[in-house]
């Protein structure tokens, strides 16, 4: 993994917590905490923030959302104080589950002046979900193992009026992004078509054979759907004949939980895969994955163009493998979308339960672990072998 100019310790933690609507204060109480210790006086966001109506101009919406969030003088003062403490702030937005209606707002648009906070290198941004689980240490095993699932059912267009997935193009795009890493650093396996739930589960099992730690990353490319009436999310997988087969959110969560080892990152490059019901903050696919133990989930909160998803994914992986910080990588990938003039740049969303955004150990930590192994210590790992992303065989999912 390449050296990075950015260190997690360079950022000061800034948590913005929004509490449920409180009639006694005519709005939603808001609490800003800096560095995990300095807690500012609570302010409030007016209940008039809902319903949210987009102007159709992302920059205007972002500034309006920012001004509404910090309309209370107490909150403006807290924000100003945080900027005085450090220009580099890791922003974690925590919305209480009982304020679920606020999850539908496009918080990734938040803009102060000319700066979109979720696209600036000084303000890594995430939707933070506090889960009562032990913190996961950064991955020190090498190679980092990625399972890629590209689902292109034959009847997508005829049955659901959805565009076919260009499997070859998607694979080449991912291979290009991942090949920037040394061959001993990362291993990418592509699930063979048809991408059935059964083959996916078998591939996850194979990933833990021989004492391996399982897949660190699960990357899905395809289409998703959300039922507002049923408040359910689904991914379009395939059956054995290659036709569309819906995999419901609970089914995917249960499958991952059964494997014993959760991926550290799930990337859902699927339309609507991050949309959630306003009735319950944890009914969407991404929050369910985080609540089940996945440290970080990148997904889409609305319909997204294929080109946007592709550009975002390629930049995201390059940057993540450069400095190991998932929230910073999302910001950098979003910045690329803005530079390219993509109007849906705010659609990708990061949900995470980590405080510092670090998924993978820094290179010096990995080298230290390898040295322990070479000197006979416990917990060593084997790094080596001939590997190239483009030349690797696919996993078929068969025993």
Language-model regions: role of each:
Residues 109, 114, 118-133, 241-261, ...:
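Caspase-like cysteine protease fold
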Residues 90, 143-144, 261-264, 293-295, ...:
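Short coil/turn connectors at secondary-structure junctions
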Residues 135-241, 268:
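A domain-level signal for caspase-like cysteine endopeptidase catalytic cores
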Residues 391-399:
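C-terminal, disordered and strongly charge-biased linear tails with low hydrophobicity
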Residues 102-110, 157-158, 276-277, 360:
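Short helix/loop capping segments that flank catalytic or ligand/cofactor-binding pockets
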Residues 72-83, 128-134, 197-206:
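Short alpha-helical segments and helix-capping/turn motifs at coil-helix boundaries
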Residues 1-126, 138-140:
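Non-catalytic, solvent-exposed interaction/assembly segments
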